[in-house]
């Protein structure tokens, strides 16, 4: 292998409703991982400035990054980041969507309704954890994606994320304060804040565990349960429902899909 191939890097970008997750791969190794806020009004120049600063801090040369893959659930930011990479990195991103090979057969009423991030997670799980699998991605929304024993995507569930739930209870009431989402020491809160933290945290665990159990029952077999997303580690502290916690699952899925679509 020549030196150029050995140092070839890939930028994987997962654009979500709350944050933009950016990973830099060298081969299979994730060299760096950053999160930027998802701000539709932010200009491409602003995102480029942030990203170039992070690259400099990590001692990664921008000129090395001409391979880029993205998945997005925020169309305006898709356009913004395409501009970032075309202008500042001279790279045209591969955007996960129609016509892109993922290795995942989708058995849904309308396959086009399935979000790109969910397809990417399924692609990662299919490679990393073959067989029946339930992927629980905990972000702005919490998605439950199910793979059959043969690795086909057969559907799932969508629920509010834990932060979304906490925000809703504040916005829909007049006296309840904003709270930090933590793993409380006990369920019985001794004041308003601790009572809210208990209800949000343990109530959310109940939601996740019940949906996983129902999906397992409908599958008729034990499926591996993989947690990912920004709140995966925090929720896994209070639940034994997960077999694996893999915060970088989406980035890994993007890497696999890029390999499948290389020209």
UniProtKB/Swiss-Prot annotation:
ATP binds at residues 14-21, 140. Substrate binds at residues 115-118, 192. K(+) binds at residue 137. It catalyses: (R)-pantothenate + ATP = (R)-4'-phosphopantothenate + ADP + H(+). GO terms for biological process: coenzyme A biosynthetic process. Pathway: Cofactor biosynthesis; coenzyme A biosynthesis; CoA from (R)-pantothenate: step 1/5. The active site is at residue 117. It is an enzyme of class 2 (transferase). GO terms for molecular function: ATP binding; metal ion binding; pantothenate kinase activity. Catalyzes the phosphorylation of pantothenate (Pan), the first step in CoA biosynthesis. This is Type III pantothenate kinase. It comes from Dehalococcoides mccartyi (strain CBDB1). The gene is coaX.
């Amino acid at each position: 292998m020549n030196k150029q191939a050995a140092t070839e890097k890939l930028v994987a970008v997962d654009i979500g409703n709350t944050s933009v997750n950016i990973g830099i791969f060298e081969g299979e190794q994730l060299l760096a991982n950053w999160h930027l806020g998802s701000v539709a009004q932010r200009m491409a120049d602003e995102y480029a400035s942030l990203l170039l600063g992070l690259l400099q801090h990590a001692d990664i040369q921008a000129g090395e990054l001409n391979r880029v893959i993205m998945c997005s659930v925020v169309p305006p930011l898709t356009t913004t980041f395409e501009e970032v990479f075309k202008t500042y990195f001279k790279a045209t991103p591969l955007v996960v969507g129609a016509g892109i090979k993922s290795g995942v057969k989708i058995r849904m009423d309308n396959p086009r309704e399935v979000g790109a991030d969910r397809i990417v997670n399924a692609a990662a799980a299919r490679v990393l954890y073959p067989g029946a699998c339930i992927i629980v991605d905990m972000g702005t929304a919490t998605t439950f994606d199910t793979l059959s024993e043969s690795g086909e995507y057969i559907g799932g569930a969508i629920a509010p994320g834990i932060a979304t739930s906490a925000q809703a209870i504040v916005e829909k009431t007049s006296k309840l304060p904003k709270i930090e989402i933590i793993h409380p020491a006990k369920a019985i809160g001794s004041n308003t804040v601790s009572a809210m933290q208990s209800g949000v945290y343990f109530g959310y665990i109940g939601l996740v565990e019940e949906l996983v159990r129902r999906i397992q029952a409908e599958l008729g077999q034990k499926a591996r349960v993989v947690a990912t997303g920004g709140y995966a580690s925090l929720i896994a502290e209070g639940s034994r429902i997960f077999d694996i916690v893999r915060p970088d699952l989406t980035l890994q899925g993007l890497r696999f899909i890029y390999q499948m679509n290389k020209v």
